[in-house]
From Swiss-Prot:
GO cellular component terms listed in the entry, alphabetical order: cytosol; GMP reductase complex
Identification of the protein by name: GMP reductase
Organism in which the protein naturally occurs: Serratia proteamaculans (strain 568)
Binding sites annotated in the UniProt record for NADP(+): 108-131, 216-239
EC number(s) from the headed UniProt entry: 1.7.1.7
Catalytic activities: IMP + NH4(+) + NADP(+) = GMP + NADPH + 2 H(+)
A GO MF term: GMP reductase activity
Keyword annotations from UniProtKB, A to Z: Metal-binding, NADP, Oxidoreductase, Potassium
PANTHER family: GMP REDUCTASE
Keyword presence, Zinc-finger: no
Family: Belongs to the IMPDH/GMPR family. GuaC type 1 subfamily.
Role: Catalyzes the irreversible NADPH-dependent deamination of GMP to IMP. It functions in the conversion of nucleobase, nucleoside and nucleotide derivatives of G to A nucleotides, and in maintaining the intracellular balance of A and G nucleotides.
Length: 347
C-alpha cells in the first residue's frame, strides 16, 4: 500500500482564466479538427465530440442527428446484425463516416463486430469498450482486433493513467478512452472505491498519448458545456458525452408516465436496469455499478448540441483560440472554491 500525495482535480475544481483575444465574434471560431490516426493511417475531419455508446444515447437516430453537426456517435453494441444492415442501407455515407461500431471483448462480440464492419466500407471506427481497461484479456482483444482490422480506427478503453494509455497505443489503439467512474449514472467510485478525478486523468493521459502519436477521448464527467471546454483545454482530442445528450427524442429510451408527466429512463450500462435488459439480470458474483434516473423529455437533440457547441466557441473566444485545436495551448486553469452564483439555482 502507498499514498500519492498529489492532489487530483475534477472539472468542478477549476475555471479557465480569460486571456487577451483578437477574435471579434464567436462565429470566427473553427471547431473542426483534422486527425491522421497512428495505426490505421486514416484521416478524419469533424467536430471531435462523441455520443456515448449507451443504449439510450448511442442510437441510430442519434447518429443521424449528430452527423449533421459533423459530430460522432459511438453506436451501442446491442443492435442486431439485421438492424445494422437496415441502417447501413438507409443512411448516406456522410452519416456512416460519423459512426463508431461498439464492441465488447468476448469471442461472440469479435465475430459480430467483423460482420457489422463487412456491411459497408464506410464504417471506419471501432470502439472497444469495457469498464476496466487494465486487464490482460482486454489488451489481448485489442491486439487481435488490430490484426484483424488494420485499416480501421480503433478507440479502446477505459483507463485513467499514463502507463496504461501507452500500453494500449502500443497494442494497436489509435484513440484511448479515458475515465473511470465520472459518469452521471455511474456508481463505480462508490461501489468499489476505485477512480480518478477526470481533469487530472485527461491531462496526464493526453501527455502520454501525444508522446506516442496517439489521441485520447475524455469519457464522462461533463455536466455543462463549460466542462466540455475544460476537457479540451486539458488536452483531450475528443470528448464523449452521455448524460448531457440523454432524454432526447433521438435516444430511443423507455418512456414512463407519472402523475400525467412523461419521463425517459436513463441508466448506466453496468446498472441493474441495463443488466436485466441485456443479460437477464445481475450475476450473483457482481454488484451493479450504475443507477437509473428518470429525465423529463427534452425534445430534439439539435437544440442541446447547438448549446454545447455555442459554449465551446465562446470558451475559445475568451482565451483567444481561433481554432479548437489551439484551446489547450491557450488554456490556463485556476483552482477555485466556487463555480457559479446559485441564488436562482444551478445552471
Amino acid at each position: 500500500m502507498r499514498i500519492e500525495e498529489d492532489l487530483k482535480l475534477g472539472f468542478k475544481d477549476v475555471l479557465i482564466r480569460p486571456k487577451r483575444s483578437t477574435l471579434k465574434s464567436r462565429s470566427e471560431v473553427e471547431l473542426e479538427r483534422q486527425f491522421t490516426f497512428k495505426h490505421s493511417g486514416l484521416s478524419w475531419s469533424g467536430v471531435p465530440i462523441i455520443a456515448a455508446n449507451m443504449d439510450s444515447v448511442g442510437t441510430f437516430s442519434m447518429a443521424e442527428a449528430l452527423a449533421s453537426f459533423d459530430v460522432l456517435t459511438a453506436v451501442h453494441k446491442h443492435y442486431t446484425l439485421e438492424q445494422w444492415a437496415a441502417f447501413v442501407q438507409r443512411v448516406p455515407a456522410s452519416v456512416l463516416r460519423h459512426v463508431m461500431v461498439s464492441t465488447g471483448t468476448s469471442e461472440a462480440d469479435f465475430v459480430k463486430m467483423q460482420q457489422i464492419l463487412a456491411l459497408s466500407p464506410g464504417l471506419k471506427f471501432i470502439c472497444i469498450d469495457v469498464a476496466n481497461g487494465y486487464s490482460e484479456h482486454f489488451v489481448a482483444f485489442l491486439q487481435k482486433a488490430r490484426e484483424a482490422c488494420p485499416n480501421h480506427v480503433i478507440c479502446a478503453g477505459n483507463v485513467v493513467t499514463g502507463e496504461m494509455v501507452e500500453e494500449l497505443i502500443l497494442s494497436g489503439a489509435d484513440i484511448v478512452k479515458v475515465g473511470i467512474g465520472p459518469g452521471s449514472v455511474c456508481t463505480t467510485r462508490v461501489k468499489t472505491g476505485v477512480g480518478y478525478p477526470q481533469l487530472s486523468a485527461v491531462i496526464e493521459c493526453a501527455d502520454a498519448a501525444h508522446g506516442l502519436g496517439g489521441q485520447i477521448v475524455s469519457d464522462g464527467g461533463c455536466s455543462v458545456p463549460g466542462d466540455v471546454a475544460k476537457a479540451f483545454g486539458g488536452g483531450a482530442d475528443f470528448v464523449m458525452l452521455g448524460g448531457m445528450l440523454a432524454g432526447h427524442d433521438e435516444c430511443e429510451g423507455t418512456v414512463v408516465e407519472e402523475n400525467g408527466e412523461k419521463f425517459m429512463l436513463f441508466y448506466g450500462m453496468s446498472s441493474e436496469s441495463a443488466m436485466k435488459r441485456h443479460v437477464g439480470g445481475v450475476a450473483q458474483y457482481r454488484a451493479a455499478e450504475g443507477k437509473t434516473v428518470k429525465l423529463p423529455l427534452r425534445g430534439e437533440v439539435e437544440f442541446t448540441v447547438r448549446d454545447i457547441l455555442g459554449g465551446l466557441r465562446s470558451a475559445c473566444t475568451y482565451v483567444g483560440a481561433e481554432r479548437l485545436k489551439e484551446l489547450t495551448k491557450r488554456t490556463t486553469f485556476i483552482r477555485v472554491a466556487e463555480q457559479e452564483n446559485r441564488v436562482f439555482g444551478s445552471n
